[in-house]
């Protein structure tokens, strides 16, 4: 069979790579893909992004099903368009994707269905937002309502930072339309985890747990990013936390969407904050697999991903199970110079073959120049994954592979997975 994956990041490289491991698969097309998907066995890039062009391609190539990687096409209704054309696709509808594309929608939904999350209020007026923050005090969290590539959240430790974030979004147009409304919520303390499941509208199949590292610099310093590394499994998600996350967050969300008349299908990602008592709170929802969490999670999946996606599309997720490698996977992101503000592009990358002999390199912001060299082409450039019998071994493997790679201005965190090692 032939499949299509929409997107061009590390998440899409990992999903396409895992789908291609199925004996049922002849080719996985990636639209538009990157320099890594261009050379991966059984993968083929296609330079298409418009929904109608993708629909025509799927019809002409007899594509069995499509998996959507990033949030932007979901928010733009790609699932609705494919379904209207009678094509199989795994992802949420435009309405359901509002759980990610509008923070205000998600918070109102959580309030309605009693899903644990931080107290909040939404503002379009800067003066009202400033007054609210003055009343609440710091630390406090300011979020752009719309999609901002993981960079629309400011954890303000002081009132000055909070007021500056409000002005940037509501008056300075720093986030464009995404920041025309802001959600201001209480600061939650605890340890974060990524809880990702597959949903077919009614049934839920949990993926392996993971923990992301959002901040640019070691010790969780610096600005928020799309994610600088992740590991799986996440020890903070104990069996008790797992049970509570399923019963208090995931299942009520799936039931709530159904009650709204919009069944949720696709990957559902709950970003959790787990407090000192082991109570999980929802920081955010994403309507797709996380990036970089996908890379370590897919590195541990022993099951045929094609079988799981087919079951989900057919509404039969209750008939399949996911088998996992008991090893730990650690993924470390290599970012371009000046990321996250204005990443430098076009720098030649060396050492990829050697790195792939030690671990697995998933490409994100990469392209090929006219000489055929792999070059930087985005903020987060690569994610290097190492597997090991414990977290320390997996971390060591990932960094051993990473150290063979070179490009100008390369930046990465040196403490990915240390929280798990130091537990």
Residue spans of the language-model regions?
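Short acidic-hydrophobic, aromatic-tinged amphipathic segments that line or gate anion-handling sites
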Residues: 44-50, 121-125, 156
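ATP-binding N-terminal substructure of ATP-dependent carboxylate-amine bond-forming enzymes
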Residues: 1-94
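Solvent-exposed alpha-helices and their adjacent loops that cap or buttress functional pockets
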Residues: 21, 38-39, 90, 112-114, ...
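Generic C-terminus detector
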Residues: 366-371, 375-423
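Internal nucleotide-binding/catalytic subdomain
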Residues: 152, 156-294
């Amino acid at each position: 069979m032939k499949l299509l994956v929409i997107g061009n990041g590390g998440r899409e490289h990992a999903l396409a790579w895992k789908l291609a491991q199925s004996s049922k698969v002849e080719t996985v097309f990636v639209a538009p893909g990157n320099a890594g998907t261009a050379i991966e066995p059984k993968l083929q890039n296609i330079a298409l992004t418009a929904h109608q062009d993708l629909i025509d391609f799927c019809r002409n190539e007899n594509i069995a099903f499509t998996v959507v990687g990033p949030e932007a096409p979901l928010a733009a209704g790609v699932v609705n368009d494919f379904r209207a054309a009678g094509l199989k696709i795994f992802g949420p509808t435009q309405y359901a994707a509002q759980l990610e594309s509008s923070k205000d929608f998600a918070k109102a939904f959580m309030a309605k269905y009693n899903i644990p999350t931080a107290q909040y209020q939404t503002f379009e007026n800067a003066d009202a937002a400033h007054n609210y923050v003055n009343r609440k005090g710091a630390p406090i969290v300011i979020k752009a309502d719309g999609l901002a590539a993981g960079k629309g959240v400011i954890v303000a430790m002081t009132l000055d930072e909070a007021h500056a974030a409000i002005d940037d979004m509501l008056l300075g147009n720093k986030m464009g339309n995404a920041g025309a409304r802001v959600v201001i919520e209480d600061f939650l303390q605890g340890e974060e985890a990524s809880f990702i499941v597959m949903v077919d509208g009614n049934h839920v199949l949990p993926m392996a747990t993971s923990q992301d590292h959002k901040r640019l610099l070691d010790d969780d310093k610096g600005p928020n990013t799309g994610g600088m590394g992740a590991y799986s499994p996440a020890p903070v998600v104990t069996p008790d936390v797992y049970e509570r996350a399923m019963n208090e967050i995931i299942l009520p969300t799936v039931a709530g969407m159904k009650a709204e008349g919009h069944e949720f299908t696709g990957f559902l990602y709950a970003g959790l904050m787990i407090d000192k008592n082991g109570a999980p709170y929802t920081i955010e929802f994403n309507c797709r697999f996380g990036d970089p969490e996908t890379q370590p999670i897919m590195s541990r999946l022993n099951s045929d991903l094609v079988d799981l996606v087919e079951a989900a599309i057919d509404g039969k997720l209750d008939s399949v199970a996911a088998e996992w490698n008991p090893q730990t996977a650690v993924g470390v992101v290599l970012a371009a110079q000046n990321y996250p503000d204005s990443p430098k592009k076009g720098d030649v990358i060396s050492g990829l073959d050697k790195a792939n002999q030690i671990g697995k390199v998933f490409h994100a912001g990469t392209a090929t120049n006219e000489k055929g060299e792999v070059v930087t082409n985005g903020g987060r450039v690569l994610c290097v994954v190492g597997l090991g019998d414990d977290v320390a071994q997996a971390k060591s493997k990932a960094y051993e592979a990473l150290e063979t790679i070179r490009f100008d201005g390369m930046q990465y965190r040196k403490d990915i997975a240390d929280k798990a090692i130091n537990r």
